[in-house]
C-alpha cells in the first residue's frame, strides 16, 4: 500500500532537487554552519559564541546545530579560537583525517552552576547581579547531547578565560562523544574550576591525546576505545579501556592496595570494530561520506599510520532531509536507494522511516531528533547487512510505541553473511520523556546478527517534562536478539523492568552503566516475580550459552521515601563458561535515597544500601 502510494506520486523532481546536485555546497539547511580558513576569525568567533549562548542551558529545547570546519588552520597561539559547546551541538572537521583541520585554541564543555538557577560560563553565571559573582553547585552531571569529532586541537592556554583557559575541557556526562580527535596539550574530563564538579560520562573512540596526561578527575565512569594516551590520572568507579595504546594496566577492584582506589578494566584489543561514518571534503572540494572498514582485534586509532581504511560515498547519493520533510518523502528516497543525511532539527514522524537495503548510511548532523506521532517505531532497519546509523536522537512520542528503533526484521533468522559487513549503531540516543511527554515499551531492539553498538544512551527521563512512574512509561531500553552482537559503551537508565535483555548467543558488552529507576512508588509496583524484589538491570536470557561482559555497573537511588530493593543488579545463566563476566559493581548513590541493591549477580556479591553509600560493591568475575 505504501509503495503503491509512493509510486503514484510524481517523485522524480522532488527527489532530484533534494539530493545533493552541487558538489561544492550541498544545502544542509540554516543550522549547519560551515567555516573555512579564509573567513575572518572574528566572524567565526561571533558565530560559535552565538550558538553557545543559546545552547549552553538549552537542555530540552528544539534548536539543533552542526558547526563544521573545512580543512585548514583556525586560530593562532596568540589569538586562539576558543568556544564552549552547548546542548544539541556537534562540532566536526571536514577533513578526511583529523590532521586536516587544526584548531589552535580549545573547544570546551564546562560545568553548569545551579546556585541561582542559571548556567555557568567561565566559572560565572550569565545573568548574575552584580556581574562576576561566583556560583555554587557547579557540576557536569546534566551535560548531555553534544559531540566533537575529526579534527586536531593544539590546546592554547588562554589567560583571558582564567582557570578555564588552562586546558581543553570536556566536562560531560552521557551522549557527548569524542571521536577521531587529536589533542596536543592538557585535556580534562571534569571542570576543576568550580565545584563540586560531579560528572557522569563518557565515551572516547579513535582519538589521540598527546603531550599530557588526561585528567579523569570526578568522572564516575568512562570508556575509551581504540585510542592512544600519554597518561590517565585516575579512576573512580568504572574506567574501561579497550584497544588503547598507553592505557592503565588492568586493576580491579580499585580497593586493592596495588590499585590505589583506581579501578581499571583494560582489554588489550577490541574484538570487532567499525568506526562511525563521517562527512568530509576531498582534495577537489567535493563532499563525501566516508565509511570506515571493519577491523578485528584492533588497537589504537585507525589513522595512526595513514588514512583510515574504508570507502567513500559521494554526496550525490544522499538525500538531504530537512525537519519539515514528511516521512513519506524521506521513505521514498530510501526506497529509491538513496542514503540519508538528517539535518539538524526535530522530525515529527507519522510513519516509520524504513531503511530497506544493505549498506544504507543514515547520518545525523547536529543531533536530529525523531519523534513518532502515531505509536509507530521511528525507524526500522529492514536489512541485516552493513546498515550504519550515526548521530541521532530517538524521542518517545505521545502515543506508546512498541519500539523506537528496530534493527532487523526477524530475531530468529540468523545471517552469518553479515559478519564481514556488520551493521553499526553509533552515538544513537533514546529518550522517554524529559523534552516532552512520551511513552515507548522498548527503545532499541536488535534482531540482526553481528551488529556493533558503539555509544548508546537509552534514558527514561528522571527530570524534565512528562516525568512520572505512570507518565513516561518504558519497560526496557535495549533488547538484543541477534547473535554475535558487540557493544561498546552501553548506558541504559531508569527503565521500569529489565533495562537490558540479551537473548542472543556470542554477544559481548564492553562497558555498561546503569541507574535503576528512581521512582517506583512501592516495592509491590516493582517486582520481577512473586518473591523477587525489583528487576535486574542486565538480564542475559536463560537459554544463552555464551556471552562476555567487561566493566559493568549498576547504581541505585530510590527517591520516593520508601524502601525499594532490587534482588540483583545482573542476572545471567549459571551455566555460562567461567569468567564470562568481569569487573562488575553496584553503588548506592546517595544517603538521601532508600532501599538499594541486595546482590551484584545471581545472589552473590553483597549489598549496596545506606550502610555503604558511594562505595563500590564488586565481583571480579562470574561464574
Please name every model-derived segment.
Residues 80-84, 99-142, 159-174, 187-198, ...:
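Glycine-rich beta-solenoid repeat tracts in large extracellular/virion proteins
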Residues 87-96, 140-156, 175-187, 199-211, ...:
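Right-handed parallel beta-helix
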Residues 20-46, 295-327:
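Right-handed parallel beta-helix/beta-solenoid
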Amino acid at each position: 500500500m505504501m509503495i503503491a502510494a509512493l509510486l503514484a506520486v510524481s517523485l522524480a523532481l522532488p527527489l532530484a532537487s533534494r539530493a545533493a546536485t552541487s558538489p561544492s555546497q550541498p544545502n544542509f539547511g540554516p543550522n549547519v554552519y560551515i567555516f573555512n580558513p579564509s573567513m575572518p576569525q572574528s566572524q567565526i568567533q561571533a558565530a560559535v559564541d552565538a550558538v553557545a549562548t543559546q545552547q549552553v542551558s538549552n537542555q530540552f529545547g528544539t534548536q539543533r546545530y552542526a558547526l563544521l570546519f573545512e580543512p585548514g588552520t583556525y586560530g593562532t597561539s596568540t589569538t586562539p579560537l576558543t568556544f564552549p559547546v552547548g546542548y544539541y551541538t556537534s562540532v566536526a572537521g571536514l577533513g578526511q583525517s583529523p590532521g586536516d583541520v587544526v584548531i589552535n585554541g580549545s573547544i570546551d564543555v564546562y560545568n553548569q552552576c545551579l546556585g541561582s538557577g542559571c548556567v555557568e560560563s567561565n566559572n560565572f553565571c550569565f545573568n548574575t547581579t552584580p556581574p562576576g559573582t561566583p556560583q555554587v553547585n557547579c557540576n557536569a552531571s546534566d551535560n548531555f547531547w553534544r559531540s566533537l569529532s575529526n579534527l586536531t586541537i593544539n590546546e592554547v592556554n588562554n589567560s583571558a578565560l582564567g582557570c578555564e583557559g588552562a586546558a581543553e575541557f570536556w566536562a560531560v556526562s552521557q551522549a557527548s562523544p569524542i571521536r577521531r580527535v587529536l589533542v596536543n596539550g592538557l585535556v580534562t574530563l571534569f571542570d576543576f574550576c568550580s565545584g563540586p564538579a560531579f560528572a557522569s560520562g563518557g565515551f572516547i573512540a579513535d582519538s589521540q591525546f598527546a603531550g599530557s596526561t588526561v585528567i579523569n578527575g570526578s568522572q564516575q565512569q568512562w570508556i575509551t576505545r581504540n585510542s592512544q594516551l600519554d597518561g590517565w590520572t585516575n579512576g573512580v568507579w568504572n574506567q574501561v579501556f579497550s584497544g588503547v595504546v598507553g592505557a592503565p594496566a588492568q586493576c580491579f577492584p580499585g580497593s586493592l592496595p596495588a590499585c590505589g582506589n583506581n579501578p581499571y578494566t583494560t582489554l588489550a584489543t577490541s574484538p570487532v570494530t567499525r568506526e562511525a561514518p563521517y562527512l568530509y571534503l576531498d582534495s577537489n572540494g567535493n563532499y563525501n561520506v566516508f565509511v570506515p572498514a571493519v577491523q578485528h582485534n584492533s588497537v589504537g586509532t585507525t589513522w595512526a599510520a595513514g588514512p583510515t581504511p574504508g570507502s567513500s560515498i559521494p554526496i550525490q547519493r544522499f538525500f538531504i532531509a530537512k525537519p519539515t520533510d514528511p516521512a513519506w518523502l524521506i521513505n521514498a528516497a530510501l526506497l529509491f536507494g538513496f542514503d540519508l543525511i538528517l539535518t539538524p532539527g526535530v522530525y515529527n514522524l507519522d510513519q516509520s522511516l524504513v531503511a530497506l537495503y544493505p549498506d544504507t548510511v543514515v547520518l545525523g548532523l547536529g543531533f536530529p531528533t525523531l519523534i513518532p506521532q502515531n505509536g509507530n517505531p521511528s525507524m526500522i532497519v529492514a536489512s541485516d547487512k552493513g546498515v550504519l546509523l550515526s548521530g541521532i536522537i530517538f524521542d518517545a512520542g505521545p502515543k506508546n510505541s512498541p519500539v523506537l528503533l528496530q534493527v532487523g526484521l526477524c530475531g530468529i533468522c540468523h545471517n552469518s553473511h553479515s559478519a564481514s559487513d556488520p551493521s553499526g549503531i553509533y552515538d544513537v540516543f533514546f529518550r522517554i520523556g524529559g523534552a516532552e511527554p512520551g511513552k515507548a515499551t522498548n527503545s532499541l531492539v536488535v534482531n540482526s546478527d553481528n551488529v556493533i553498538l558503539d555509544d548508546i544512551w537509552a534514558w527514561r527521563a528522571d527530570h524534565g517534562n512528562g516525568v512520572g512512574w505512570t507518565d513516561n512509561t518504558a519497560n526496557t531500553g535495549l533488547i538484543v536478539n541477534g547473535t554475535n552482537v558487540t557493544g561498546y559503551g552501553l548506558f541504559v537508565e531508569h527503565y521500569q523492568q529489565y533495562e537490558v535483555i540479551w537473548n542472543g548467543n556470542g554477544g559481548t558488552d564492553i562497558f555498561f552503566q546503569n541507574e535503576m529507576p528512581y521512582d517506583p512508588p512501592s516495592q509491590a509496583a516493582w517486582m520481577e516475580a512473586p518473591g523477587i524484589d525489583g528487576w535486574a538491570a542486565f538480564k542475559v536470557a536463560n537459554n544463552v550459552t555464551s556471552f562476555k561482559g567487561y566493566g559493568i555497573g549498576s547504581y541505585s537511588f530510590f527517591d520516593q521515601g520508601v524502601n525499594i530493593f532490587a534482588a540483583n543488579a545482573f542476572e545471567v545463566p549459571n551455566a555460562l563458561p567461567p569468567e564470562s563476566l568481569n569487573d562488575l559493581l553496584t553503588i548506592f548513590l546517595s544517603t538521601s535515597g532508600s532501599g538499594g541493591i541486595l546482590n551484584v549477580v545471581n545472589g552473590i556479591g553483597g549489598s549496596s544500601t545506606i550502610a555503604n553509600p558511594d562505595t563500590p560493591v564488586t565481583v571480579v568475575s562470574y561464574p
